[in-house]
Amino acid sequence: FKRFFKNKTLNRLVLASVLLAFAQSLTGGLFVIFMDSILELGDYASRAIFVNFTFAVIGIFLWRYISLKYTKHFAASLCLLYAGILFLLQFFVVLYISDASETVKAGVLFFILAMYGISFSGAAPLIISMVADVSDAEEAESDINKSGAMFAYYTTITKVGYTFAVAFPYIFLESVIGFDISLGSDNSQFTK
C-alpha cells in the first residue's frame, strides 16, 4: 500500500477524482437550496434532477466515443472543461432570468441542466479507467496483481472529496454567511 503513495500517475488520478467528487457533490448538495431559495422553483427540483441524470446517461456514450477516438486523458480534460464553462455560465444565466416568470426560469434551468448533465458521467468513469491502466502497468512491472488494493486506495481517498463537499458548504453558509436553510427563500438578499 505504501508503494501507491509514491506512484505519481496514480496520485494525480486520485487527486483529480477527489476534486471531481468534491465538485459534483458540492453542486448536488447545494442543488435543492439553490432551487428553493434562489430560483424559488422548489417544486421542480426532482424533475430537474431527473433531466440532469437522463442526459448524464446519454453523455456516457459521447465521452466514451471521444476517449476511443483520441485518449482517455483528452476526453476527461475536455469533459471537465465543458462542465466548468457551463457551471460558470449558469451563474450569469441565473442573474439574467432571476426576475422572469416561473415557466421561463424552469425551461431555461432544464435546458442548462440537460447540457450540464452530459458532462456529469464523463470524467469519473474515464478516471477509473485510467486507474485500471495504471494497475495493469504496475502488474506488468511487478508481476503481482494489485488491482484490488489500488482501487481500494483510490476509492477510500476519493471519499474524502465527497465528505468535505457534504459538510463544508452547510457549515460555511450557516456560520460565515448567516444563511438559514430552514428559511428557504425568506433569507435576506445578502445571504442569498
Predicted region positions:
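Membrane-embedded alpha-helical bundles of multi-pass transporters/translocases
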Residues: 1-192
